[in-house]
């Protein structure tokens, strides 16, 4: 649905190490937060964090199109954009040294073009970018990258995945976070977990968060996943479990999934962090929602 020109959009942008995701809320619409598909007419929410350049020509592609073009047309593929920007070393592409932060800005700009599904980037009223860790160097990189977007708003903020998980939880029905809430994120060689528990007897409610990382050397190991699940949920009340990452699957999670589903609500998806960033920005922004 196209929007009347006066309405602003609040954007939650999850900037991961390999993928990005974008969720948005149309201020004043009363609609739910929407996660943008990277492929028209589909439910593909993950955007590969990659660019590719056509050799000899200043023509760039991003996301899955960048990967495809590099494979089929011998384009120059540039991945790990966030790491490259953080490291700060010039990137040699097609005989030219390029600023890695400028490459990240290009990716952000192109991917925000997905807002054309509901509006356009000029209607961004507030932007929250969330990433795994947020130290001083990452803040410096994100500030520089977003400055290059020249958005018509000063409401640009950054937060960690932990904070996005917190805000996502607060906007869910209370029965899902009445007791402990567990998030498991499938990383490359590990399972990263966040456990949140709220003390509802305080005003305001105080949330306790614990981060852990479990080695996961053998991909799709049901036995190892069951061991992790038992460590996280054993001998305590857990209201809900979120499995983040496309690698989680019922095909290999037999006993571990059966254990997790026993007396708990279990959800699988990929857009929790971008939605949490959007919920957070809805609270922080000066836009009437």
Predicted regions, residues:
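Gly/Thr-rich phosphate-binding beta-strand-loop-beta motif of the actin/hexokinase/Hsp70
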Residues: 2-33, 170-206
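A short acidic (Asp/Glu
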Residues: 22-23, 137-143, 167-171, 191-196, ...
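Conserved phosphate-binding loops in N-terminal lobes of ATP-dependent enzymes
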Residues: 37-130, 212-226, 231, 238
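Short, flexible helix-coil linker/hinge segments at the edges of structured domains or between repeats
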Residues: 151-170, 175-176, 190-223
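Conserved phosphate-binding/catalytic loops in two-lobed NTP-binding clefts
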Residues: 150-164, 255-276
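Glycine-rich phosphate-binding loops at beta-strand->alpha-helix junctions
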Residues: 127-139, 230-257
């Amino acid at each position: 649905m196209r929007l009347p020109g006066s309405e602003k959009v609040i954007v939650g942008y999850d900037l991961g190490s390999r993928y990005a995701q974008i969720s948005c809320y149309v201020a004043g619409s009363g609609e739910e937060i929407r996660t943008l598909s990277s492929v028209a007419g589909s439910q593909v929410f993950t955007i590969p964090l990659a660019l590719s350049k056509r050799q000899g020509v200043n023509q760039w592609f991003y996301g899955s199109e960048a990967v495809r073009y590099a494979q089929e047309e011998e384009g120059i593929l540039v991945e790990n954009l966030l790491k490259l920007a953080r490291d700060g070393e010039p990137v040699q592409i097609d005989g030219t040294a390029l600023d890695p932060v400028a490459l990240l800005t290009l990716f952000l700009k192109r991917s925000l073009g997905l807002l054309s599904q509901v509006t356009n980037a000029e209607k961004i009223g507030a932007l929250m970018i969330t990433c795994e860790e947020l130290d001083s160097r990452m803040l410096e990189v994100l500030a520089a990258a977003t400055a290059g977007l020249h958005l018509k708003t000063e409401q640009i903020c950054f937060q960690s995945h932990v904070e996005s998980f917190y805000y996502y939880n607060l906007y869910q029905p209370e029965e899902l976070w009445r007791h402990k809430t567990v998030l498991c994120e499938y990383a490359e060689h590990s399972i990263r977990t966040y456990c949140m528990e709220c003390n509802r007897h305080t005003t305001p409610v105080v949330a306790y968060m614990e981060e852990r990382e479990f080695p996961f050397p053998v991909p799709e190991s049901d036995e190892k996943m069951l061991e992790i699940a038992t460590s996280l949920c054993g001998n305590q009340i857990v209201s809900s479990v979120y499995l983040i990452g496309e690698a989680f699957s019922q095909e290999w999670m037999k006993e571990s999934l059966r254990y997790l589903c026993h007396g708990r609500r279990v959800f699988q998806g990929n857009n929790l962090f971008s939605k949490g960033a959007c919920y957070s920005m809805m609270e922080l922004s000066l836009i009437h929602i």
